[in-house]
Amino acid sequence: MAVEHSAHYERMSLEEYLALVEQDPEHAYEYLDGRVYMMTGGSPDHSIIGSNLNGLLQAFLRGRRCIVYNSDVYVQLSDHYRACPDATVSCDPRDRGAQEVIRYPSLVAEVLSPTTEARDRGQKSLQYRSCPSIQEYLLISSEFPLVEVFRREKQGFWSLYTLGPGDTIELSSLGLRFPVADVYQNASFLEEANE
């Protein structure tokens, strides 16, 4: 999710966290094992990349049983973890009609920012990969064209595919392929490199 705000919160119980979310619906708060992180908007490139990815997913999945969500929707990973990925896909009928929380995502993606990258690669990555419904997890750089696709294989282990300019992203859980360049269309760092 976007960028961590400077607000610092002491450890909270789940009940205290839920009360905070209810009291302040204008902000998103991630809850990671008792620690609360207020999330705010990221850089323009972060927004462009997230919008591009969500648009690609939405266009492909239109009319199918899967739903694409942006970072406005929480993903509940357990009683101790609630995150706001930049893109989430759920194909599970139990998530249809969910108002605020998705519990059975098949794919999640995080657009990395300097303030959240360590958490996205560490604690959240472990939680995403321990969620039985998640088949693919993407980490997308917001500073240069680099996409990492973590894929759950049939044997239960995870494979990592690191992709750059000229490569094609394959999301096998959805049957979707698209160029890395499509995710980065209109990103300012690409335009600056071409000037």
Predicted region positions:
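Gly/Pro/Ser/Thr-rich low-complexity, intrinsically disordered segments predominantly at protein N-termini
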Residues: 1-195
